[in-house]
Amino acid sequence: MAKKFRVESDTLGEVKIPENSLWGPQTQRSINNFKIGQPGSMPTEIIHSFAILKKSCAISNNELMNLEKKKMKLIINVCDEILQNKHNKEFPLVIWQTGSGTQTNMNINEVISNRANILSGKSLIDSKYIKACLLYTSPSPRDIS
C-alpha cells in the first residue's frame, strides 16, 4: 500500500509530508537532511519542556495583550495533549541536529499549529491562524541553555 502525502510549500519550496502527520515542512526537511541516529530519538523530556515553555509563553502573551484568549486556549490545549503523550509519534526528529535546537523548536511549533487548526475546525495546513502566535513562544538558544 502506497503512503499518501500532502504537499506544503514555504520560502524554501515544496516538500512532501505524510498526509496525516501534524508536523510541517521544517520538520520534514530535518527528517530528510539528518539521516543519522535513531528516528524519534529526541527525549520526551525535551519535548515536554518545549510544551511547558510554549504554554507559559501563550499565557504570558495573553496577559500582555499580545495574544487573544481563544488562540491562547488552543495553544494550551495542544500543549496539554503533548504533556499527556498524545502526540509522541509527531516528534520524529533525531537528537543529532544543529546546535541551536531550531529543528525541534519548529517541530513543536508545527505540531501545535496544525493540531490547533484541527481543534478550531480549520484544515490541517491552514497554519497561518496559529503560527503567528507561536512567534511569541520561540526561545533563543540562550533562553534554554
Task: Describe every region a protein language model picked out.
Residues 2-94, 107-110:
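Generic N-terminal targeting/processing segments that precede catalytic cores or assembly contacts
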Residues 63, 115, 119, 140:
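Active-site catalytic microenvironments for nucleophilic, acid-base chemistry
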Residues 81-85, 114-122:
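Mid-sequence acidic-hydrophobic segments that form the walls
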Residues 105-117:
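A generic, well-ordered mixed alpha/beta core segment in the N-terminal half of proteins
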Residues 107, 120, 125-130:
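Helix-loop-helix junctions within predominantly alpha-helical proteins
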Residues 136-145:
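Single conserved hydrophobic/aromatic residue that forms the stacking wall/gate
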